[in-house]
Amino acid sequence: MRKLALVPIQFYRYAISPLMASHCRFYPSCSCYAYEAIDNHGLLRGGWLSIRRLGRCHPWNPGGYDPVPAVPTSRSSSMAE
């Protein structure tokens, strides 16, 4: 399901986005952020992070560097080391 959700984002990034001028006020761009968020966090959490990011993408937000949050590590894997 995750990979299927990434297809429209890839289509936008490679077919539509090059035809438009760069307008994203964030780095990475909103489409790159959405792709990375869904790929790293899954469809539900990554989708929610993407929606929140798109909600911040407006003229009154200064933008800037806004990376995808790191995937939380489980306590059991950190205790095993």
Swiss-Prot record:
GO cellular component, one term: plasma membrane
Position of the signal peptide: none
Sorted UniProt keywords: Cell inner membrane, Cell membrane, Membrane
Membrane protein topology class: Peripheral membrane protein
Compartments reported by the entry: Cell inner membrane
Pfam family, one: YidD
Top-rank taxon: Bacteria
Function: Could be involved in insertion of integral membrane proteins into the membrane.
HAMAP family for the chain: UPF0161_YidD (MF_00386)
NCBIfam families: membrane protein insertion efficiency factor YidD (TIGR00278)
Family from the record: Belongs to the UPF0161 family.
Protein name: Putative membrane protein insertion efficiency factor
Species annotation: Pseudomonas syringae pv. tomato (strain ATCC BAA-871 / DC3000)
